[in-house]
Amino acid sequence: AGGNGGDGGLIGNGGAGGAGGVASSGIGGSGGAGGNAMLFGAGGGVVALTGGAGGAGGAGGNAGLLFGAAGVGGAGGFTNGSALGGAGGAGGAGGLFATGGVGGSGGAGSSGGAGGAGGAGGLFGAGGTGGHGGFADSSFGGVGGAGGAGGLFGAGGEGGSGGHSLVAGGDGGAGGNAGMLALGAAGGAGGIGGDGGTLTAGGIGGAGGAGGNAGLLFGSGGSGGAGGFGFADGGQGGPGGNAGTVFGSGGAGGNGGVGQGFAGGIGGAGGTPGLIGNGGNGGNGGASAVTGGNGGIGGTGVLIGNGGNGGSGGIGAGKAGVGGVSGLLLGLDGFNAPASTSPLHTLQQNVLNVVNEPFQTLTGRPLIGNGANGTPGTGADGGAGGWLFGNGGNGGSGATGTNGGDGGDGGAGGIFFGTGGTGGAGGVGTTGTGGDGGAGGAAFLMGSGGNGGSGGAGLTAGGDGGDGGNAGSFFGAAGTGGAGASTKAGGTGGTGGNGGLFANGGAGGSGGLGGDAGTGGAGGNGGLFGAGGTGGAGGSLGPGAGGAGGNGGLFGAGGTGGSGGHGTPAAVPG
């Protein structure tokens, strides 16, 4: 095993942990832990390691009590043989104001190693992003690491994306929960599921990670991660997290992954809001040439707020998800909500529809209500949420064709509160290139930006992921960039959205698997007090470069760059 790094002094950084030893057979040694900082300084990172079966990466060191960055967890060891990839190390804990460290990426192997968990945030800091799951050549891709929990007043960290595999993609990691007393900070977004399979052998996409929950009283739930693409079945979208009990909107469910041969993935369910807030939109079902996935269920309002839209069904006869019912006092039901048996509720809905009509006609958005979802297969944009409050509608998926059509952009969130709509997935290119995913919709004052849509698969080149939407100016999380499609030439991951005043930038989307693998998307820029987002992982086989970390705000740290993809000496398509 590698030795541990030394602890820093009163003003100084912790030392890096040593690399684990290489084993020609058996298991490689574990990496040493990074040293801890004391008052002013950064925790030590950990050197990557290799081995017969990969050893585990060491844990990142903790940040200084007052200032300094938490250490990044070490990468798990990799192998090009039949052994297992090592697990990534956990990120270090943040100091008083610092974000937790990013978890290490899992090592590549016959089964991919799990990504390391993001470190816990300091008292006012957000949790760290979970590590990317490792690539697998003959079994399951590694599971993405869970996002770190926010400090007492901090936001939850984003879950890591699942590893790609030639058989079955790994599941995305769950987003971390926000701190108990967080004043508007959101739960972390779930990680994107890994892509799975080959054109000749089929394969299954990994499920998206669940969004983290907000704090006890205030804040929005994190969005669920999108399911991965599968050459047979697409992965299921992750459910959105729940909001604080008083104020906040439920997180949006993740889109289901495209299933090229059999079935598209089911969209994730939208999260539950607080007393004041909108239910989360359900994710769109994944497209398929055989059976499209059903859309996710929209979250139900409580007192004041709209029900979430039911997710649109995927191309291939997928059914739309059931929409959420509005709050008891004020709000509009989400798309595809069940007919009410209450005369009072029916009257309330009819009156609101009459009030909304002139606003919709003159401005293109209602006074109160969600924007409409874009029609699947058209690439239509989602509608904007209400002038007072409402979620943006999900973008429609792109059309299947010689070259796939681009997915529609998600609609903007409402002015006072509301979540931006999720971008639509790019369409499949039957003989050419796949379509690009749509961008996530932006929030305005209080709300989270929508996640970008995944790029569409294509015979010659995959589509790029859509960019994540920007967070609300005051509260809410930035959207995650969509994943690039896996094919002969993998697509580039989308750029994460920019944070608001206190929010970190969104994570970049992972690059697609391929002989010429896609580059990970860049992390979004942090707000005034926020850190830059983590760059997306590069696609494997090619391999692809990791995405650049986002720029920190005036008082925030820069984001960690994404891990590069794993190359293989074997012949690859493309």
Question: Model segments located where?
Answer:
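Long, compositionally biased tandem-repeat segments
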Residues: A1-G574
